[in-house]
């Protein structure tokens, strides 16, 4: 019972870190990166579909992204979605593919993006801590129901604290790397 609670908590913490990694990856840096487009999508036959599933996205140069839709009919919709996104880029459509020149970030914009990265990191740490709290409640319930002794639950709580600290440190490291990447000129 205790092992199941710890395993489930660790699994959920891992998911929180994965979501944080994806969120941080969607924040654009000064370089072109296909991950910038992970959160952009269009209405495709009645369903919201990410453009990463509707087009090939290549980075031939450090500041250039080329988006080639699998269906030519989706070209304008994809271009509009990119233009309306919060990426701050201006796509150009040549009839077959979309070229996106990624401009250099201003110092002010870099600072805003660092704040955004820290905010997303903090959200991830809150998620990890919420998982810990729920697992602690579960351990208390196990002890109260007499399914495990006080010593076993105490050891499990210490193990849970170590696991929580490890995942919080992973999130901190992700944010630190993203911050360094954003501030690099």
Swiss-Prot record:
InterPro entries cross-referenced by the UniProt entry: Ribosome_recyc_fac, Ribosome_recyc_fac_dom, RRF_sf
A Pfam family assignment: RRF
Keyword Protein biosynthesis belongs to the record: yes
Main location class: cytoplasm
Keywords: Cytoplasm, Protein biosynthesis
Coiled-coil blocks: none
Localization annotation: Cytoplasm
UniProt GO BP: translational termination
Gene Ontology cellular-component terms listed: cytoplasm
Highest taxon above the source species: Bacteria
Family: Belongs to the RRF family.
Function per UniProt: Responsible for the release of ribosomes from messenger RNA at the termination of protein biosynthesis. May increase the efficiency of translation by recycling ribosomes from one round of translation to another.
Protein name: Ribosome-recycling factor
Natural source organism: Rhodococcus opacus (strain B4)
Gene: frr
